[in-house]
Structure formats: C-alpha cells, structure tokens
Amino acid sequence: MFKHVTVLLKETVDGLDIKPSGTYVDCTLGGGGHSSYLLSQLTDGGKLIAFDQDEIAIQNAKEKFSSYGEQFVTVKSNFRYLSEKLHELGITEVDGILFDLGVSSPQLDTPERGFSYHHDAPLDMRMDQDAPLTAYDVVNSWSYEQLVRIFFQYGEEKFSKQITRKIEAYRENKAIETTGELVELIKEGIPAPARRTGGHPAKRVFQAIRIAVNDELKVFEEALESAIDMVKPGGRVSVITFHSLEDRICKTTFKRNSTTPQLPQGLPIIPDEFKPKLKLITRKPILPSDIELEENNRARSAKLRIAEKR
C-alpha cells in the first residue's frame, strides 16, 4: 500500500487560494495527500492534473481518485516537462501549481529502491525506474573530483574528500554494490567524534547521490520557471522544500521574478518586460507547527513558500 504522511497539507493547498472551478497542477503526486485535499475543494468544472515519475504512485492515485472521473488526470513524467505535457493536454494556463520536493515515504521505505541508508539494498535511487543513471553508476564510475564536488555541494558534507578516498580505495578491488557497503565506507571516512553528532553519518552523502542521479536541482529550477509562466494572473505557486539547496533556488527565483531590476532614472513608465511577474505571498517561509512535528518527524526540515502571478 502506498502510504505517505503529507507535510504542510492545509497550508500548501489553502495557500493556492483555490477557485472551485479552476485548473490546478500537483507536480509531485506521491501518496496523493495534497491532491486529495485539493480535489475535495473543486466543483464539477474544476480539474487537477497530477505528475509523478513513479508508476506505483500513479496507479494508486487512479484507484483512490477514480470517483472524480475526468476531473483528475495523471501524467507519468518528470515535472521538468511540465509545460510540454500540459500543452499536450490542450492546457495553456492554470490557476495554481504545487511542488512537494520531499522523497515520498514509500520510496524511502521500499528497501530495493536504494534510497535508504537504514536498509541494505542495491544502489539505485532513481525516482524514474526507466532512467539510465543509477547510484551504482555514480559511486563506481564517477571520478574523485566529481564525487567530492557533489558530496560537498549537494550534501554539504564536510568530510567529502575523506569519504571519497575510502570509496576510491575500495572500488579498486571490487565494485560497491549495496547501500550497506556504501554506509560502511562513509562511516570510515568520517572521524569518530563527528559521527556521534548530526544524525545518521550517511545522510548527507545519500542526499547528494540522490540529487545527482535524478538531476534534482536543475530539474526543479527549470520546472519552477515553467510553473511561473503557466500560471495565469492571480494564480499561485506553492513550493515545499526540504533542504537549503532547494530552498535557495525557490527563494532566489521568487525574488528575481517579484522585483523590478535597476532601470535608468526618469523613465515615464516601466516597460512590460521589466515589470515583476510575481507578488510574494510569503515573505518568510511557513514552517510546520509543533503538533505536526510531533506527528511526523520527516516534516522537521520542510519550508513552504508561496507566490502569486501579477
């Protein structure tokens, strides 16, 4: 069963300021939590298009929301193709779009998917099971310099070089095939005092590899720009991020699109191409409540930002 505790459920959907007959997009269907709450607010004229790369998530949602008929449409695709896929459906603008960038719990909790450092499993980490690049390829084929870069940039791992040296030495003799093998090498690369603080020692490296395998940051940056273009004036974009790299992209993109660039003084009017596209609904991110954190530990790093098309 595809179970997943949805983070910031009401805040994210209510932040879209739902119009009952509007057209909305859930870019990250997952367990269908946000979609379920959103669909419950639509009348017969309303529609929700939901994206996911995971076939299990798609099939589960089709069964779960079958009573909504043509109001609910699934798209098995990476949300980097948001604009393209919506145009294929004959949709040129929408009333709101949401992103929940966390890895869904079923993916984390299914050992054979290779996302979790708590289970021994083949190194995979692909969100899209048909994609060619796996965690095995990254760990065994990428150069010392490439691994150090992603561990440091994507995982913000202080001991990137030490961990990569352990990986290099090990793979000279045999391939690193499982998450368990990789966890042991990560532990060896981190000094004992540092291992005792800051959560699981493999957390940052696993995050970095997952981001690299799925090209997550570039994909999100492209999709967020597409979302801003696809939303009609008065429509909104809600984004939940789970680490500082994603949040920085969201914050920067929203800020750039909501401010007027420096223009020569004395211009009688601001040319249309320089007018801000967005109005910020959240100046500072919305964080989970204490009650939500008690009920769902995975919500602790979540941040929600919302912007409205001008």
Curated annotation (Swiss-Prot):
One Pfam family hit: Methyltransf_5
Top-level EC class: transferase
GO MF term list: rRNA (cytosine-N4-)-methyltransferase activity
Principal place of residence: cytoplasm
GO cellular component, one term: cytoplasm
Record InterPro entries: RsmH, SAM-dep_MeTrfase_MraW_recog, SAM-dependent_MTases_sf
Keyword Methyltransferase: yes
Catalytic activity from the UniProt record: cytidine(1402) in 16S rRNA + S-adenosyl-L-methionine = N(4)-methylcytidine(1402) in 16S rRNA + S-adenosyl-L-homocysteine + H(+)
Signal peptide start-end: none
Positions annotated to bind S-adenosyl-L-methionine: G32, G33, H34, D52, F79, D100, Q107
Documented EC number(s): 2.1.1.199
Keywords from the named record: Cytoplasm, Methyltransferase, rRNA processing, S-adenosyl-L-methionine, Transferase
Highest taxon in the source lineage: Bacteria
Location in the cell: Cytoplasm
HAMAP family documented for this protein: 16SrRNA_methyltr_H
UniProt function note: Specifically methylates the N4 position of cytidine in position 1402 (C1402) of 16S rRNA.
Record-stated family: Belongs to the methyltransferase superfamily. RsmH family.
Protein name: Ribosomal RNA small subunit methyltransferase H
Species, as recorded: Bacillus mycoides (strain KBAB4)
Organism ancestry: Bacteria, Bacillati, Bacillota, Bacilli, Bacillales
Gene: rsmH
